[in-house]
């Protein structure tokens, strides 16, 4: 496995790859959710490149960029074990050669980025768009793999690729869950045993909503009330029913409905969702 730390090294490596290239962009602290994305890329492509880069531009003023976990050696060991061909792990100066005030400004499409996570984390998706575009430009992948757990991010990336006419297939990947059904996340390590049990209300609420929909309930207000009842012990940021343009729904639309939840358990903020 190659470990590439500079843009020059990545370009030199990439120019010799003639068959399909799968790309899994990450911020490191890899878990089984990331592993499922990597394994799918390995299965579907001749070469797989994983990026490990904690992107400063997607952190808000009140978010601690310096505290984000960076277990690089552990991440590299996992990638090598899985059979990844190359890991791109650049320093900030490689990805951002200019100071903030000298950089080009990137703006995620407002209709997809202003609500939900965008309303809580101002500028977050602008930073995501910025770094993903740079990575796409450098890696030039055949396919790029994104988890459905970050649903809003996935919709923005799909829109980005279509709007900018990029010849990249975006491969949405199912949400990976632990044995207790909690969605896998790098943030789960911050939960103590009590908080972990409390957090299980999130997948339970989504599962109960799904069961109600399967039985024929289509009124979003009733389904929301059902979910909030299960989430009552948590600090809920939102539980919303939207279509794939993130427009609010009053009635479930088959194949075009997202149920999105964000809630705080102690000091840890968790996301989960249901694609109907």
UniProtKB/Swiss-Prot annotation:
Q: In which pathway does it act?
A: Cofactor biosynthesis; (R)-pantothenate biosynthesis; (R)-pantothenate from (R)-pantoate and beta-alanine: step 1/1
Question: Which sites bind (R)-pantoate?
Answer: 58, 153
Q: Known Gene3D superfamilies for this protein?
A: HUPs, Pantoate-beta-alanine ligase, C-terminal domain
The UniProt entry, under CDD domains, shows: PanC (cd00560)
Q: Which GO terms describe its cellular component?
A: cytosol
E.C. code: 6.3.2.1
- A molecular function GO annotation: pantoate-beta-alanine ligase activity
Q: Where in the cell is it found?
A: Cytoplasm
Q: What does this protein do?
A: Catalyzes the condensation of pantoate with beta-alanine in an ATP-dependent reaction via a pantoyl-adenylate intermediate.
Q: Its family?
A: Belongs to the pantothenate synthetase family.
What PANTHER family does the record tag this protein with? CYTIDYLATE KINASE/PANTOATE-BETA-ALANINE LIGASE (PTHR21299), PANTOATE--BETA-ALANINE LIGASE (PTHR21299:SF1)
**Please, what other remarks does the record include?**
The reaction proceeds by a bi uni uni bi ping pong mechanism.
**Could you tell me what this protein is called?**
Pantothenate synthetase
Q: Which organism is it from?
A: Helicobacter pylori (strain HPAG1)
């Amino acid at each position: 496995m190659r470990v590439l730390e500079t843009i020059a090294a990545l370009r030199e490596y990439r120019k010799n790859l003639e068959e399909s290239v799968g790309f899994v962009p990450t911020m490191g602290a890899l878990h089984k959710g990331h592993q499922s994305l990597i394994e799918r890329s390995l299965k579907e492509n001749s070469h797989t490149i994983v990026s490990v880069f904690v992107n400063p531009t997607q952190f808000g003023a009140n978010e601690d960029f310096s505290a984000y976990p960076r277990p690089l050696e552990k991440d590299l060991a996992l990638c090598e074990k899985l059979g990844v061909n190359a890991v791109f792990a650049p320093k900030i100066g490689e990805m951002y050669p200019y100071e903030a005030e000298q950089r080009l400004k990137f703006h995620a499409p407002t209709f997809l980025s202003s609500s939900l996570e965008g309303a809580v984390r101002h500028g977050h998706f602008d930073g995501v768009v910025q770094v993903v575009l740079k990575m796409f430009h450098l890696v030039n992948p055949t396919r790029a793999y994104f988890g459905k757990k970050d649903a809003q991010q996935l919709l923005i990336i799909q829109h980005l690729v279509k709007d900018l006419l990029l010849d990249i297939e975006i491969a949405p990947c199912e949400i990976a869950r632990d044995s207790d059904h909690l969605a896998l996340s790098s943030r789960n390590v911050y939960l103590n045993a009590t908080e972990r049990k409390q957090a299980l209300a999130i997948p339970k609420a989504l599962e109960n909503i799904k069961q109600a929909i399967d039985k024929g309930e289509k009124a979003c207000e009733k389904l929301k009330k059902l979910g909030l009842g299960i989430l009552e012990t948590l600090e809920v940021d939102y539980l919303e029913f939207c279509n794939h343009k993130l427009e609010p729904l009053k009635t479930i639309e088959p194949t075009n409905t997202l149920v999105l939840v964000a809630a705080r358990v102690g000091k840890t903020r968790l996301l989960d969702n249901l694609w109907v």
